[in-house]
């Protein structure tokens, strides 16, 4: 089970690196997935779970790294791609993650988010 989880995580990271929008964004999906790797158990947990401190540290680090509109759009696309790749994803936990970590982002972490509309 642990080996298959590790393999799934490696596959997820590889998919995100290949799919990452390379255009003008300096923020890569590898960075996003590395920052948010500690969040995987929370994202698969039942409703009302609490994210572990390393997860929130990664969320805050990612927020600090995404300083330009292209970076924020790239991070959004990476999050969207990752959300679609996580088996047993609890969409309520994904949407609640920023707030539970004490940060605010102007979009929902979801497979249906239109990342091209992010402008700030």
Swiss-Prot record:
Disulfide bridge positions per record: 29-78, 39-55, 56-101, 76-115
One term of GO molecular function: lipid binding
InterPro entries: Bifun_inhib/LTP/seed_sf, Bifunc_inhib/LTP/seed_store, Plant_nsLTP
Annotated Gene3D superfamilies: Plant lipid-transfer and hydrophobic proteins
Alphabetical keyword list: Disulfide bond, Lipid transport, Signal, Transport
Signal peptide: 1-25
A GO biological-process term: lipid transport
Listed Pfam families: Tryp_alpha_amyl
Tissue: Expressed in roots, stem, leaves and tendrils of the mature plant.
Similarity annotation: Belongs to the plant LTP family.
Entry function: Plant non-specific lipid-transfer proteins transfer phospholipids as well as galactolipids across membranes. May play a role in wax or cutin deposition in the cell walls of expanding epidermal cells and certain secretory tissues.
PANTHER family registered for this protein in UniProt: NON-SPECIFIC LIPID-TRANSFER PROTEIN 2-RELATED
Official protein name in the record: Non-specific lipid-transfer protein 2
